[in-house]
UniProtKB/Swiss-Prot annotation:
EC number: 2.7.7.7
GO molecular function list: 3'-5'-DNA exonuclease activity; DNA binding; DNA-directed DNA polymerase activity; nucleotide binding
Reaction(s) catalysed (UniProt annotation): DNA(n) + a 2'-deoxyribonucleoside 5'-triphosphate = DNA(n+1) + diphosphate
Annotated family: Belongs to the DNA polymerase type-B family.
Record organism: Pyramimonas orientalis virus (PoV01)
GO biological process: base-excision repair, gap-filling; DNA replication proofreading; nucleotide-excision repair, DNA gap filling; viral DNA genome replication
Enzyme superclass (EC): transferase
Highest taxon, organism lineage: Viruses
Protein name according to UniProt: DNA polymerase
Gene3D superfamilies named in the record: DNA polymerase family B, C-terminal domain, DNA Polymerase, chain B, domain 1, Helix hairpin bin, Palm domain of DNA polymerase, Ribonuclease H-like superfamily/Ribonuclease H
Keyword list, A-Z: DNA replication, DNA-binding, DNA-directed DNA polymerase, Nucleotidyltransferase, Transferase, Viral DNA replication
The encoding gene: dpo
Amino acid sequence: MNFRDHSISLDESKNACFQVIDWYHFDYTNEDSNESQYIIKMFGVTEEGYSLCVNVTDFQPHFYISSKTKDKFTQTELDDLEEYIINKLPYNFKNSLSVKQVRKKSIWGFTNNVYKQYIKLSFQNIMSMYITRKMLQYRIKVGRVQVQFDLNESNIDPFLRFIHIQNIKPGGWISIDEYTTDVDDELESKCQINITTSCENVQPLDCNKVAPVNIMSFDIECTSSSGDFPVPIKTYKKTAEEISDLYNSFKSDSHHDGFIPALYKCFMGIYTDEKEFMNDCGTYCNKNLLECNTNNIKFAKVYPKKKKIDLETIFQKLQGYTDTIVDILKNRSKHTVFQEENDGLEPSVVNQLEVLLNSFLPPLKGDPIIQIGSTIHQYGSTKCSYKNVITLDTCNDIPGVDVITCKTETALIKEWCKLIHRVDPDIMTGYNIFGFDFDYIYKRALELGCEKYVLGCSRLEGHKSKFKEKMLASSALGENLLKYVEMEGRVFVDLMKVVQREYNLDSYKLDNVASHFISGKVKTHNKTTLHLDSAAGINVGDYIKLNNTYKCMVLSVDSNIIVIDTELDEKIVTWGLAKDDVSPKEIFACQKGTSADRAKIAKYCVQDCALCNMLIIKLEVFANNMGMANVCLVPLSYIFMRGQGIKIFSLVAKQCRDDNFIIPLIKFDQDSEEVEGYEGAIVLDPIPGIYVEAPISVMDYASLYPSSMISENISHDSIVLDKKYDNLPGVEYVDVTYDIFTGVGDKKTKVDEKTCRYAQFKNNEKGVLPRILMKLLSQRKSTRKQILHKTVTTNDNRSFTGLVDENDDSVTIKTTDNNTITLSRNEILSSVDTYNDFMKAILDGLQLAYKITANSLYGQVGARTSPIYMKELAASTTATGRNLIMKAKEFMETNYGADVVYGDTDSIFVDFKVKEKYGLLDKDALQKSIDISVKASDAFKKELKAPHDLEYEKTFFPFIILSKKKYVGNLYEHDVNKYKQKSMGIVLKRRDNANIVKIVYGGIIDILLNRQNISFAINFLKESLRKLVNGEFHMDDLVITKTLRTTYKDPTRIAHKVLADRMRNRDPGSAPQSSDRVPYAYIEHDIKNKSLLQGDKIEHPSYIKENNVKIDYIFYITNQLMKPICQLMALALFQIPKSSKPEIYERKLKSLTLDYEGNKKRAIDKVSDLKQKEIQKLLFDETLVHLNNKRMGNREILEFFSVTPV
């Protein structure tokens, strides 16, 4: 490992070239002149792996203002404006403003390229810009008149504007030709190289490589004085909870006479043993207390910060506050110590007690950090180059790990901070570091008085960073509270948040994530020896999980052959990397044990760190997110720490600058809510059924919404908002009409229509948004092709790079410079992939970023809080998409006699009736449907405006569709011999269902698709129900998980919230936090008690196991399995023995249609409900009756005849 703990000299005659990793901007005040100057710092890494900081000292923050009432200002008026603003600025900002009049176009509405006057305000520092921005919200006297100015682009961060102006990528390569290494002391950083330059010298460097970035993963281990989950700063909350529990145990005593003696007795043991307490407090403590009844409640011990405490004084104070404690418990306290200001909410009894106890009892010690593990790898390497663990107390050596031991926790934290400075990581990562590690480290440092070391870990010299708590909300993650210590110049990546955002997994525990992603196939095995498809990522001492069941340790690795520590006789098919399970209790015990015991914790800690490095590599986290940052023109840190809005805004702002447009500042009214909405994406009503003999081909519009914006030129600068720009001679227009609705769901009502008019520019030029989208889609297409590039070398050492088309005799190369070269095979010396796996990963991340960004642009146009929000654009886009879906449906039905059985947003599902028309079955039918789909999509393309294209995507065969957005089938693309099961919306895709649903419902689906036998499906269901009620399924298959939100309207009715609160009462430290997924299972309860809420019917799996609580199997049948299975099997009702005849339901449908006054949809839904009820009666009722009788203790009639029910 090459540590970055030494400076590097640069030759100023050579360009400074580096890849940017992070950005920081601030105002720097010169102590001599007292003038403030705006500074941009770029932190990066050179090709050699050196860390570098560039100070850009002369960029001027600026924004624009305009007036609706006054278009042009004289120089005198501009001077008056400048003088007015300067006079309002603080004294040391007097020389920081310049005012200039410029000509620009407004993006807000079509103006036929008409320019107008704007005033550009430029500043020496950002603070004066902020002050002026606020000042201009009010009318200002210019000359003799009061002018209300409109702000434009005052919401663009100056350093983002610098990125736009210099045309650089915020995570790309930079070249600086003129600079100085003589940097002011105040601007020095801790990087190895420090330079200062002018903004004009910062130029983009065309380079596809990724610098050898240092990525450091870290993890902490803590112990607990109480045996509960560790808490960094302790209060008397647990004692308060115990007092409340003790009080409740005396509720049968109307006067609570026994409570006070019991309180004193329980209190005796929290600091010391009873005997010592009695000796110290004998004067004040009646020894008869030892005989009093505490209802078997014992308070947990606490550990004050001071070793010596005055027990006598404590007991005196306790006696003095006894009446107050009782008042609180009776909810009568008005003591000022309990008053809370937050939202006027009445604090809970426990909170009031906690505040009181904290006010007079000695402060407590928090639970210490006992180890911090760190592992480092450089981008481009697949292995960690350095592993380190810092331990509290002694620890045995660990092979390959640098073990540093410390005598105190303060020394441990200081050593870790030193390590950060030595390694100088560019990226810091870990698992749940925003939810646990950072917060814990900071709070422990705060209690120990060494927080200055933690707050000094940034790359800024002499800078004290801040601890931040930040709420980040997104559609992918919901609400997230991020807690972290700022380290300017370093980028934080919480791997747990990344995985939660991008992947849908059953569990987000590190063990499960590792085994899911770092996994493969077992080719062959012989007891302890396994031949894997690839052993990449596996090291000696690692743990792997086989068949997702058996956890084994790896004893040796030789190429792709490994030896494990367990003999296995059954067939092993899959492997996945796992982690060594060490429970919290084991960690607590090991810390109190020997050096060898502590080494066990250390190995576990380092293993968790290294897993994060491996996942960063495997998931290409750095390459993918850096690609997104460069596409959206925002720093890498914004991808992890900011929302979607800023990414799209920066991209649009750059295009506007290039096109000489100005973006007005939208004024948001926080209190107003739009009553009217518009119609979203179209979803065609499905024809539900099990399509066994009819292949269903799917045709999909490529990038429907981006293409719709391009084809109709939907943009801020093309929509006609001013009548004077309507019907201009020589200008063509396109009208888009959309429906306006009020209400949602069943109350959604169409109230009007609105037509928007979009100007079509000359020479097929496009507006700002379509141009951005065209670039993104074009760049994505070329990047995807680039991944496929090969480099062909001839015998005479000529080389050609591009797309290669091979046939038997020759090879044709379409080169990167658009030439076509054809070579005979005899001329070719070699043909290899142009890019290695790392470069392919970078390119793949880039093409994905282009796709996501193109789709996000439409979303931001329709988001009320977006700086580019305009509802009309979003509504016009969805209206265009709906029209195109209906057009495709009509074309297929009219020209091919097909049935469109479903349509969703951007695709149609088509039955070309190949059996009826051609008499084809099985694979012949499948191939025919694929062939027709390809031809039909080509024929339809002639009916579409560019760039729209309806492409053949896939064919389902068989296909089951239940309702809108709920279907499943075997998916084929072009090869009729290769398929995979694909589903949408069905219970198999829901994360809040128990695994039993996947086993039973998934098993039925598998039988229907692959065996196409209803009887087999019914028998499988009955056998599964038998196993369930007999307890033959593992409890893990019955666990449900749901995400815990920060707030709920009525938390008492949210089952997992009630459970989380119950867990918090049992053990505050281990309770789930906001955004955590809470696991639980349903347990048996008193079914006669109708007042029980859902939260009273569930428990945490570990609690169920430890206390032998019975599972409620009836719930899993009625609430998890029955509804989806009844909905599925109702599609095949008439094939089930003893079912009703079809004619009965046909008559019922006609009757209900009349009853519902012709509302056929409502009648169909009612008939569907009746079919599902019949399925329940046929397949479930017998088992449910049996279970209910068993729970109620009722004997069944068959028992009297010695017959066992099925």
